[in-house]
Amino acid sequence: MLIRTETLLHKTLAHWREWSFVSDNAPKKQPQVIAQLTGGLTNQSFLVGKGEFKAVVRVNSLDSDSFVIDRDRETLFLNLLQSTGCVPKLLYANSDTQVTQFLEGRCLTDNDLANLSLRTEVEGSLKKIQAIRLGNMPRRNYLKYSRSYSDQLSDFSDFSDLEAIERAAMTIDEGDWQPVISHHDLLFENIVYNDQGVYLIDWEYAALGHPLIDYLRVFGPKYCISKADAGTVEALVVLQLGLTKLWYAVKGNNKSVRDIK
């Protein structure tokens, strides 16, 4: 564990009385680290607890700026979405760390979408989230956003399709659509479900975005084709795949870039 990570983790735990406890199982003493959670590509997260209380402490990456992450916006969105019951309860957040409710359950899989009841529940969660409105925040400019990544790269040898990504971004930017709160990284690993419902986690890439961008990630282009014209759906597909490639390139994982189809 890096010294920075260890320092921030223990500092956050030491200030546990500042957390916003929302249930009867609030700890009487400082929570302790139970285990480091694996699987995340950006940050380092830890399961902590005391007695029946459990939470997740996330230590934010130092590369937040490189990955175009706005931590203040993430916190704003999570606070706004608490009433939907579709996101983990936010207990504490600052620029370096975040503490959220630990959710028992498992992540969604592709096979789960064959379950009509669960599929409908995921759709319902997205509808609840998109129904929450913001005032004066501008919608995401996808061309500017894509260039925030590509401008960091000096070698485009793996990006012969960079022009296609930017054309797709411009197509979406020039479209007539109403922005909604969009997760923008809605991998199955970021959808947890249990007997209480479906929860969307890890909101660090969220912004006001295109209303189909999250549906596309979860349900695929065939689902979206009945909700927009073919040109828009095609542009969203190219854009989403392109942004994923750019993200991996900035991270420096060239193998991952080549393996994305």
Label each PLM-derived region with a short phrase.
Residues R58, E74, H183-D185, N190, ...:
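Acidic active-site catalytic centers that drive phospho-/nucleotidyl reactions
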Residues V180-I181, N194-L243:
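Active-site Asp-x-Gly
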Residues G85, L126-L134, I172-D173, K222, ...:
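A general structural signal marking secondary-structure boundaries and capping sites
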